[in-house]
């Protein structure tokens, strides 16, 4: 938001401060000023001069010698400007006197930081005591002064007073401030809003424009009707009519104010609507009344696929959420964004229909994105406007039309306002505000702040009445903030917080996840982070059956694309994508882990999905099934699950190798799965090595985990180990061996460890060699052979009964 300081001062009489003082005070009171630009920064000793005569230069064909009246004296100036010709006289021009400064050169290039100083000198032997200026030398451009000649001296109007300040005459004695306005302060997206804040900040009176009654004795309600069909998207629509339009340039004061806002003047009618939009923050639109079929306005939504050509000549395809302004037969504008080519204002216009309305900001914002068209007006509407502002703004526009004699305003207004807004009321609780702020501001002082902000006080009800333009004031904290702004944040004393402090801690579930990360990192895995969104096509890549529960997903209503259209139900795709990327970049021995959240859709679409964290491991290279199994057991031991997990090879997981996979159980409860990636799935992800996957369900293990530690003394007696080697059928899982060891080991069994598996030419076909190390220990004595041998014989006997051959 940009505003002119002179425009602000017109509404805040008595405001006297430097540009820097204004910036600092406004920023401290909550209206942050990003930067400011003083138009007259490098303009000095520039006056209105009148050319008395122009003669040829005796020694230069392209130079002329001018005698110029600058008020206090006549000076001689030599110039080469193409629009100053021999024999001409009477023109009034900006003249920089000897010792003065201009902002830049006549070429309109980048302005030098300190401007250009002008000194008396000679041009081809003829003395020149100053310089006549182009608009570029004054720091402006032809964009804002369209009547300025290209490369020539700027000719001032006949009303310019010789000897007076040319800078002031051109409106360049001004400073433009750029504000950072937050979206909750919609009222500050207007000059009136900024001026109100400035008046409150500097404790000056606030005098907004006084809008007088306008219009002739006719009644506009006999000329046009308005019907709002989409009431939820248009809360108010005001229309007025102006007859006998007289297009002309707008006055210089209006052009100057528009230029400070970055708006190029066009003509009186267009300039008035732009002026009111900046002044009130209320966009307006004008239609050629004679093109409005039936002289009727209908506010409705479009039909899906409806076509409409906007003022820029572009045909746009609309949907059922697009709000349209229509006449009795056709659309004439996209509400709040741009009018239609079919109702465009031309130079021949005789009668105009003016519109000031309040449209739903969210709808306008969505429409601008859909059709790819954003305008100054839509930028205002998107933020949500005050419906009470519409009538005031359109009446102000009609007042300016009458003052500038731009047309004849028809009396009255068509005002369709189905559900008028009411002013909010909040209890006045000064003690609570002081407690929140740590201040001691009196009730009277607070009420003086609110009075400056146009917040009324109902003494009988002890309530604050909030004006409709302050949509941001909704609760105690908002009111306390207003007190802080005008008491002064820099005046609030620094105090230490009172009360007891408590030390935060992580949840038990987070402790489990941290333990998973520690184990993974300790065993050489690097953390991966992948998207929770994926494509439904992933399920086919993973070979999931058509009726798989994992195909039931939470669908995203506004996805970035098909590849991100559903929430994942398995953590596998993201992990395999990361492994594939590493493989294709020729990285070797890749080991990744992720604490991936999955989303399992509920049977009832109105219920939230079951969100579960899955501890996921993926690796290829120097890993195998058993090293991955070791990570599982290390993790379970870390979180207090001391028993050995069991494995069921009949897992039936489609994306894992059918003979190299298993469900993982603990205390007969499934906690996850492990396996080698199915070769077909590996091919679909372009992974050319054996890849292993582990998934552990964190919520399930959390129920069984414990970080309670029981300390025992160091064993007094040594352990005795026995190694056994056996040959067993390939299809028989080693878990069967471990069951026998646990069953027959008795009380003296301390631990066992699988340390070798071998398949090769020395082992008969269909079999594998397996070796275990078994440790025995007693708490009360050193074990002897007579203690261990019976136990080992029981183990051997059960192994042989299962068809396992011992190697001796």
Where are these regions (language model features)?
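Mobile "lid/hinge" segments at catalytic clefts and subdomain interfaces of large enzymes
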Residues: 128-133, 137-139, 153-154, 167, ...
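A carboxyl-terminal module marker
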Residues: 2, 452-455, 602-605, 610-611, ...
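Phosphate-backbone binding interfaces of nucleic-acid-interacting proteins
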Residues: 1-218, 353, 376, 386-387, ...
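Terminal amphipathic helices with adjacent charged low-complexity linkers/tails
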Residues: 202-228, 405-433, 440
């Amino acid at each position: 938001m940009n505003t002119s300081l002179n425009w602000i001062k017109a509404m805040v009489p008595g405001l006297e401060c430097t540009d820097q003082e204004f910036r600092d005070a406004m920023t401290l009171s909550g209206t942050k000023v990003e930067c400011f630009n003083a138009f007259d920064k490098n303009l000095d000793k520039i006056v209105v001069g009148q050319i008395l005569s122009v003669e040829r230069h005796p020694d230069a064909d392209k130079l002329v010698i001018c005698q110029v009246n600058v008020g206090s004296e006549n000076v001689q100036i030599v110039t080469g400007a193409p629009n100053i010709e021999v024999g001409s006289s009477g023109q009034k021009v900006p003249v920089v006197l000897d010792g003065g400064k201009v902002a830049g050169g006549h070429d309109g290039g980048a302005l030098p930081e300190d401007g250009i100083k002008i000194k008396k000198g000679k041009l081809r032997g003829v003395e020149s005591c100053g310089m006549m200026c182009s608009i570029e030398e004054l720091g402006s451009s032809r964009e804002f002064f369209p009547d300025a000649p290209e490369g020539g001296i700027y000719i001032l109007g006949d009303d310019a007073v010789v000897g007076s300040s040319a800078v002031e005459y051109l409106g360049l004695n001004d400073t433009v401030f750029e504000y950072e306005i937050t979206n909750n302060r919609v009222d500050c997206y207007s000059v009136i809003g900024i001026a109100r804040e400035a008046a409150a900040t500097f404790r000056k009176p606030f005098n907004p424009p006084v809008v007088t009654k306008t219009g002739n004795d006719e009644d506009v309600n006999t000329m046009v009707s308005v019907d709002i069909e989409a009431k939820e998207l248009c809360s108010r629509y005001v229309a007025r009519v102006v007859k006998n339009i007289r297009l002309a340039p707008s006055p210089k004061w209006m052009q100057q104010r528009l230029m400070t806002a970055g708006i190029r003047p066009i003509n009186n009618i267009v300039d008035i609507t732009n002026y009111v939009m900046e002044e009130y923050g209320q966009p307006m639109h004008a239609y050629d009344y004679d093109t409005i079929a039936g002289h009727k306005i209908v506010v409705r939504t479009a039909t899906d696929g409806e076509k409409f050509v906007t003022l820029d000549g572009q045909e746009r395809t609309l949907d059922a959420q697009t709000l349209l302004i229509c006449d009795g037969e056709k659309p004439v504008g996209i509400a709040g964004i741009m009018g239609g080519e079919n109702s465009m204002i031309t130079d021949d216009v005789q009668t105009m229909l003016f519109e000031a309305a309040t449209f739903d900001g969210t709808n306008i914002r969505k429409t601008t994105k859909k059709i790819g068209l954003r305008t100054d007006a839509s930028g205002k509407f998107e933020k949500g406007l005050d419906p009470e502002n519409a009538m005031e703004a359109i009446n102000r526009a009609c007042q300016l039309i009458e003052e500038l004699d731009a047309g004849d305003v028809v009396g009255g207004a068509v005002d369709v306002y189905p559900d008028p807004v009411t002013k909010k009321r909040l209890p006045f609780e000064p003690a609570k505000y002081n407690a929140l702020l740590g201040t001691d501001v009196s009730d009277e002082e607070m009420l003086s702040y609110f009075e400056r902000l146009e917040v009324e006080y109902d003494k009988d009800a002890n309530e604050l009445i909030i004006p409709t333009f302050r949509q941001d004031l909704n609760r105690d904290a908002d009111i306390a903030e207003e007190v802080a702004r005008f008491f002064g944040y820099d005046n609030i004393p620094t105090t230490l917080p009172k009360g007891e402090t408590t030390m935060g801690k992580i949840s038990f579930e987070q402790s489990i996840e941290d333990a998973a990360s520690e184990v993974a990192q300790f065993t050489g895995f690097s953390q991966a982070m992948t998207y929770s969104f994926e494509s439904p096509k992933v399920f086919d890549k993973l070979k999931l059956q058509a009726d798989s529960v994992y195909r039931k997903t939470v669908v995203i209503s506004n996805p970035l694309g098909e590849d991100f259209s559903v929430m994942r139900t398995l953590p596998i795709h993201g992990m395999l994508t990361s492994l594939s990327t590493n493989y294709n970049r020729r990285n070797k021995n890749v080991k990744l882990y992720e604490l991936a959240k999955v989303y399992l859709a509920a049977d009832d679409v109105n219920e939230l999905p079951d969100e579960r964290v899955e501890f996921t491991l993926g690796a290829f290279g120097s890993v195998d099934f058993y090293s991955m199994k070791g990570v599982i057991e290390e993790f379970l031991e870390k979180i207090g699950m001391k028993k050995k997990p069991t494995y069921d090879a009949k897992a039936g997981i489609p994306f894992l190798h059918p003979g190299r996979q298993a469900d993982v159980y603990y205390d007969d409860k499934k906690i996850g799965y492990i396996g080698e990636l199915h070769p077909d799935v590996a091919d679909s992800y372009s992974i050319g090595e054996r890849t292993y996957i582990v998934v552990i369900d964190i919520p399930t293990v959390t129920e069984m985990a414990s970080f309670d530690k029981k300390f025992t003394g160091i064993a007094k007696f040594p352990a005795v180990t026995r190694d056994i080697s056996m040959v067993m059928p390939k299809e028989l899982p080693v878990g069967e061996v471990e069951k026998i060891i646990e069953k027959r080991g008795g009380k003296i069994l301390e631990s066992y460890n699988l340390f070798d598996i071998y398949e090769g030419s020395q082992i008969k076909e269909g079999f594998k060699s397996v070796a275990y190390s078994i440790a025995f220990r007693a708490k009360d004595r050193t074990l002897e052979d007579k203690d261990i041998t019976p136990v080992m014989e029981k183990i051997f006997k059960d192994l042989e009964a299962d068809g396992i051959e011992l190697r001796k």
